[in-house]
Amino acid sequence: MSDYSPIWPGLLGDPNLTLVTDPRIDPRLLEAMGTLDFDEVEESSTLSSNPSYKECVEFVAAMEASAEPVYAKKFGSLPPVLGVTRRSEVIQGVDGNEIQLIIHEPAEGNRPLPGILRTHGGGMIMQSATDPQYMRLADELAATGMVVVNVEFRNGAGKLGDHPFPA
């Protein structure tokens, strides 16, 4: 019989690990993240190993709410991106739902420009195209001379509402 005992990575091997203490994280990423005050974000989960749909939706909403002040602090302290304008348009979705488009473009944009269609992060369950980290990224990209269309889509949970797949 073998005495082999696997060493599991991450929380499987050490349930006390956090994002900051996990030895697998690239030190450069850890250094960059150090400015985000991750101590402000709750790291423990109250979810069981088999949560109900309602518990999952509530958990996602709580996660989103706990991260918002971190992003607001980080990106709210940056100077505005100059030479960029923003406007909002609403289009009709296939279900008759309204879809907000936030259009970021160079202030001097009366000419054909390259563009990108950008969807925000959050795994299609939380966050918003108007969150400061996504607005900043779109402004930075627009400042390089392109049009950026940030799409606000229905999430599976969080502040934009509970819209189960396929929303």
PLM region spans:
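A glycine/proline-hinged amphipathic helix-loop "lid/cap" segment
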Residues: 1-98, 103
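Short strand-connecting beta-turns/loops that link adjacent beta-strands
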Residues: 96, 108-110
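Short beta-strand element of the alpha/beta-hydrolase
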Residues: 101, 111-123
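Short, low-complexity Ser/Thr-rich regulatory SLiMs
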Residues: 103-108, 155
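Catalytic nucleophile-loop/oxyanion-hole region of alpha/beta-hydrolase
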Residues: 128-129, 133, 137, 149-167
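A fold-wide structural signal in alpha/beta-hydrolase
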Residues: 142-149
